[in-house]
Each structure stands twice: as structure tokens, then as C-alpha cells.
């Protein structure tokens, strides 16, 4: 990661003032699940032994002008983390605009998931199978 001209970093306490004040253009989070319409679940899987604490993710998810996520497409069980509807508690509703994965990049729209690009060699049908049959809009 390289800080570009105009970029900034600061203490986490100051970050909440920046976030809540609407001064953050883009936030990048790591999710457990993301819905095709941009719902974000990134703080709790619902397991009984987990200590639930949403932390500042909810502030980021709704306070940034754009929320992007970066993740592996598949979870450790081989299932897509991009889902029709999140099964885990939500961090934000309809807040994710872009999904960057190890295999493809997507945009979340009101109509559903839009494919932006894939890694070289990954076919559309193979990607659809990995997504578990989730409808996929193609870029114009």
C-alpha cells in the first residue's frame, strides 16, 4: 500500500470524527458476507462462542461516501461469501458499492450484482457456479 498525494492517516480516535463528519471518501472493509444488493455482514457469525462487538465498522459502513470490501470469494467451506441475503447480523444495509475478490470484481446495484472483471482464465459459467447460482449482471 502506498500513500498517494492527498492521502492521509491518523489516530483511530480522530478517525471517528472524520467518519461521522462525512470526510471519508472510500472505506475498505473485510466481510464475512455481502449481499448482491450491498448489505454487509462483517462483525459476527452468530456462533455461540464468539464475542460479538461491531466496533467502528458500522460507522465506516454508513459514514463513508463509498464502502468497498476486499475478500476471498469463497469461505473456508468453499461457499461464496457473496450471497442473495446475508445470514449473519448486518453491519450496514445497502452500503457496499464494490466487491474486490481474489477471482473477480463486482459492483453492487439495486438490480443485483454486476460483474466488472475476472482474473484471466476464469470463465463466466465457472464464476456463476462459484457464486452458487446467484444472478449476475454483466457490464455494458
Stretches found by the model and what they are:
Residues 1-139:
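Conserved phosphate- and dinucleotide-binding cores of soluble alpha/beta proteins
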Amino acid at each position: 500500500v502506498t500513500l498517494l498525494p492527498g492521502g492521509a492517516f491518523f489516530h483511530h480516535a480522530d478517525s471517528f470524527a472524520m467518519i461521522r463528519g462525512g470526510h471519508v471518501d472510500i472505506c475498505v472493509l473485510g466481510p464475512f458476507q455481502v449481499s448482491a444488493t450491498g448489505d454487509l455482514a462483517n462483525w459476527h457469525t452468530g456462533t455461540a462462542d464468539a464475542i460479538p462487538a461491531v466496533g467502528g465498522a458500522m460507522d465506516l459502513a454508513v459514514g463513508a461516501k463509498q464502502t468497498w470490501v476486499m475478500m476471498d470469494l469463497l469461505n473456508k467451506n468453499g461457499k461464496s461469501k457473496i450471497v442473495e441475503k446475508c445470514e449473519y447480523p448486518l453491519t450496514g444495509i445497502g452500503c457496499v458499492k464494490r466487491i474486490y475478490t481474489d477471482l473477480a470484481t463486482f459492483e453492487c446495484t439495486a438490480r443485483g450484482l454486476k460483474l466488472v472483471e475476472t482474473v484471466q482464465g476464469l470463465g463466466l459459467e465457472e464464476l456463476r457456479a462459484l457464486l452458487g447460482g446467484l444472478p449476475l449482471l454483466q457490464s455494458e
